[in-house]
C-alpha cells in the first residue's frame, strides 16, 4: 500500500534532535531486563510544585485540606512549600508545625534556592519540626548556563556548593530537628551526564552522604526532552557513577511535556531509582508533573502494594479538584469519570461475559467474588477496589450492542434476557439512538424496555390489543388443562376459555379462536430475587403470523408471568403490523 502522507510544511528545521544536544550512551544498559516488584519511596509535591502552577493558588484552608488528604492516603514525604519565596508559604509551614498537624512518621519537605538569605529563612520556617527534608536546587543545563546565568560549568558548580555549605551552616540552628538533604540539578535532562554527576557528587560530599546519613539526589526531567528509554539510560548511568551509592537515595522528578511522564518514571525506577516525586492526577507546570495516581495504581493492577490508599478514588478526585480548582479529565487513568465505561458493543459483551465467568469461578472455589483473581476483559482493575460501583461500567449509545443492553437490564433490574431476546432489544435501542442520537441512560433504557414489552401505567403510552386479567385453571384426568381467562380485547372486558396440555397451550387456543395465528418457539424463566415472595420473569419467543418476536412477562406467579409474556409477544406483533 502506498504511503500518501505529505510534508506538513511546518518549520521543523528550527528544532534540534535531543541526541545532537546531549549524549546519552549506555550500550551495556541493564534496566530493560528489570521487573518492578515493590513500590518506590513516594514524595507528593502537590503543595509546592503543583500549587505554583495553579491559576488560583491554594488558600491556607485548601492547602490544609490537601495536606490532610496526602497524609490520609499514606504519603510519608510531602513537599509543603517554598517558605523563603512568600509569606504565605512560610506561614503554612509554621501552621503545620505549631498546630501539630504533622504525624510522627511524616516528613515535610521544603524547597530553597542556593542563596544565603533564602536558606536562612527556610531554616527559620522549620523551627520545632521533628524532621524535615531541605531541598536545595540550582539549574545546571547547557541552555540555562548560557542564557539565564551566563556562567560556565565551574561557576554553576560554585553556586551549588555554596548553597550546600550554607545549608550545613544553618543546620546548627535546628539542633532538635533531624534534617535530610535533597539536591536537584534542575533541568537535569538538558545537562551533560558527566557534568551532572560531578555537581551531584560534590554536593553529596558537602552533605557528608553515607549509609547512615543518606542524601537524596533528585534528577528532574524539568522539561521532558526525549523518549522515556533515554531518561532511563541517564538514570542508570547516574546510578552507577554517584558516590557513595549506599549514601544516596536516587530520586526522580519527571514532567510530562512529551506525554510520557509515567513511562519515564517507571523505566527510571527500573534503571535504579529509589524514589519518585509527583502530584495527584499530574498537576504541575505546563503539562504537569508525573501522575502519582497512575503510577500507584499501575503497581496495584500488577499485584504490587502501592503503599498508598486509593480505595476511595472519587473522594481523592473531588478533594484534588476542590484544592486545585481544576477538573480531572474524564479519561484520566483510574480516576476519570469515564475510565471504567464501555460504549462499544463488543466491549460491553466481553465485560458482561467476564463478570459472569468471575461469578462462576467464585462459586466453584467457594469464595466471594471479591476474593478471587480479577479477570474481566477491558477492565484492568475492579472498580469496587477503588470505591466505585458498577453503574457506569456499561453505558449505551449508538455504538453499543446486545452485551451492554443486557448487562444494564441484568445489573439494574435482574432481567437475564435469552441471547436472541438480547439481540432483538438491542435492535430496538439501536433504532432509537440512530434516530434521536446521544447516550441512553439506565432510566431511559428501562423506560424503552417497558414501552416495548411491558405496557402498563408506567409506559409512555397504552398500546396492545390484549390485556390479561385474572385466570383460573382446571386439570382433567388425562392431564389436559382448561384455562378460564378474563381478558381486555380492544378495550372491552371479555371472558374466554381454552384448552391445551398446559396453561400456555390453553392460552394459545384462546388466541387461535380469536383469529391470531401464534406458536411458541422458545421459553425461559427465572426468579428476579430470592425468597418466597420473589417476582418471576418469563421470556417467550413466538411466531405470530410471519413475525417472530419475543414477549416478556413479570408476575409473582410463574404461570401468570409466562401467560403475560405470550400476550406481550402477540401485542408487539399486532402493533408491528399496524405501524
UniProtKB/Swiss-Prot annotation:
The record's EC number reads 2.3.3.13
Q: Where in this chain does the record put each Pyruvate carboxyltransferase domain? A: 40-314
EC top class named in words: transferase
GO biological process terms, semicolon-separated: L-leucine biosynthetic process
Q: Name one Pfam family in it.
A: HMGL-like
Any single GO CC term annotated in Swiss-Prot or TrEMBL for this entry:
cytoplasm
Q: Which InterPro entries match?
A: 2-isopropylmalate_synth_dimer, AIPM/Hcit_synth_CS, Aldolase_TIM, IPM_Synthase, LeuA-like_post-cat, LeuA_allosteric_dom_sf, LeuA_N_DRE-TIM, PYR_CT
The entry's keywords: Amino-acid biosynthesis, Branched-chain amino acid biosynthesis, Cytoplasm, Leucine biosynthesis, Magnesium, Metal-binding, Transferase
| Any GO MF annotation of the entry | magnesium ion binding
Residues reported in the UniProt entry to bind Mg(2+): 49, 253, 255, 289
Where does this protein reside within or beyond the cell? Cytoplasm
Its chief place of residence is cytoplasm
Per its UniProt record, the required cofactor names are: Mg(2+)
Q: Please report which protein family the annotation says this sequence is part of.
A: Belongs to the alpha-IPM synthase/homocitrate synthase family. LeuA type 2 subfamily.
Quaternary structure and interacting proteins, as annotated: Homodimer.
Name by which UniProt lists this protein: 2-isopropylmalate synthase
Amino acid at each position: 500500500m502506498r504511503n500518501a502522507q505529505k510534508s506538513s510544511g511546518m518549520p521543523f528545521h528550527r528544532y534540534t534532535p535531543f541526541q545532537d544536544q546531549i549524549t546519552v550512551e549506555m550500550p551495556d544498559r541493564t534496566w530493560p531486563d528489570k521487573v518492578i516488584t515493590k513500590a518506590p519511596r513516594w514524595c507528593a509535591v502537590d503543595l509546592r510544585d503543583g500549587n505554583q502552577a495553579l491559576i488560583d493558588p491554594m488558600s491556607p484552608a485548601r492547602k490544609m485540606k490537601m495536606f490532610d488528604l496526602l497524609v490520609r492516603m499514606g504519603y510519608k514525604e510531602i513537599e509543603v512549600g517554598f517558605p523563603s519565596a512568600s509569606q504565605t508559604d512560610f506561614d503554612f509551614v509554621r501552621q503545620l508545625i505549631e498546630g501539630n498537624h504533622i504525624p510522627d512518621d511524616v516528613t515535610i519537605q521544603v524547597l530553597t534556592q542556593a542563596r544565603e538569605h533564602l536558606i536562612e529563612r527556610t531554616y527559620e520556617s522549620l523551627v520545632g519540626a521533628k524532621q524535615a527534608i531541605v531541598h536545595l536546587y540550582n539549574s545546571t543545563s547547557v541552555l540555562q548556563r548560557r542564557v539565564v546565568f551566563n556562567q560556565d560549568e565551574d561557576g554553576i558548580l560554585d553556586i551549588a556548593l555554596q548553597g550546600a555549605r550554607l545549608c550545613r551552616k544553618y543546620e546548627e540552628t535546628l539542633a532538635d530537628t533531624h534534617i535530610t538533604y535533597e539536591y536537584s540539578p534542575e533541568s537535569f535532562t538538558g545537562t551533560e551526564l558527566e557534568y551532572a554527576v560531578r555537581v551531584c557528587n560534590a554536593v553529596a560530599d558537602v552533605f557528608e552522604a553515607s549509609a547512615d546519613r543518606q542524601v537524596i539526589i533528585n534528577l528532574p526531567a524539568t522539561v521532558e526532552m526525549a523518549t522515556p528509554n533515554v531518561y532511563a539510560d541517564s538514570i542508570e548511568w547516574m546510578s552507577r557513577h554517584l558516590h557513595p551509592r549506599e549514601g544516596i537515595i536516587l530520586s526522580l522528578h519527571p514532567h510530562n511535556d512529551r506525554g510520557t511522564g509515567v513511562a519515564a518514571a517507571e523505566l527510571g525506577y527500573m534503571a535504579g531509582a529509589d524514589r519518585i516525586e509527583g502530584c495527584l492526577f499530574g498537576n504541575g507546570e505546563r503539562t504537569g508533573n508525573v501522575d502519582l495516581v497512575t503510577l500507584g495504581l499501575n503497581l496495584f493492577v500488577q499485584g504490587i502494594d502501592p503503599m498508598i490508599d486509593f480505595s476511595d478514588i472519587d473522594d481523592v478526585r473531588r478533594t484534588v479538584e476542590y484544592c486545585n480548582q481544576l477538573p480531572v479529565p474524564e479519561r484520566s487513568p483510574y480516576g476519570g469519570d469515564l475510565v471504567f465505561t464501555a460504549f462499544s458493543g463488543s466491549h460491553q459483551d466481553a465485560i458482561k461475559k467476564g463478570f459472569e465467568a468471575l461469578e462462576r469461578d467464585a462459586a466453584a472455589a467457594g469464595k466471594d467474588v471479591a476474593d478471587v483473581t480479577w479477570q474481566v476483559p477491558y477492565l484492568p482493575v475492579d472498580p469496587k477496589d477503588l470505591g466505585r460501583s458498577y453503574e457506569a461500567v456499561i453505558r449505551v449509545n449508538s455504538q453499543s450492542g446486545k452485551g451492554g443492553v443486557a448487562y444494564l437490564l441484568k445489573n439494574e433490574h435482574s432481567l437475564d434476557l435469552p441471547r436472541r431476546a438480547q439481540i432483538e432489544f438491542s435492535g430496538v435501542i439501536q433504532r432509537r439512538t440512530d434516530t434521536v442520537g446521544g447516550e441512553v441512560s439506565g432510566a431511559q433504557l428501562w423506560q424503552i424496555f417497558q414501552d416495548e414489552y411491558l405496557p402498563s401505567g408506567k409506559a409512555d403510552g397504552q398500546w396492545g390489543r390484549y390485556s390479561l386479567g385474572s385466570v383460573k385453571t382446571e386439570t382433567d384426568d388425562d392431564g389436559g388443562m382448561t384455562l378460564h381467562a378474563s381478558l381486555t380485547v380492544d378495550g372491552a372486558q371479555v371472558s374466554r376459555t381454552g384448552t391445551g396440555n398446559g396453561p400456555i397451550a390453553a392460552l394459545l387456543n384462546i388466541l387461535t379462536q380469536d383469529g391470531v395465528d401464534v406458536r411458541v418457539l422458545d421459553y425461559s424463566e427465572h426468579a428476579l430475587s430470592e425468597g418466597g415472595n420473589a417476582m418471576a420473569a418469563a421470556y417467550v419467543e413466538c411466531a405470530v403470523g410471519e413475525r417472530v418476536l419475543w414477549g416478556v412477562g413479570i408476575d409473582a406467579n410463574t404461570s401468570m408471568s409466562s401467560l403475560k409474556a405470550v400476550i406481550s409477544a402477540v401485542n408487539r406483533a399486532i402493533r408491528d403490523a399496524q405501524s
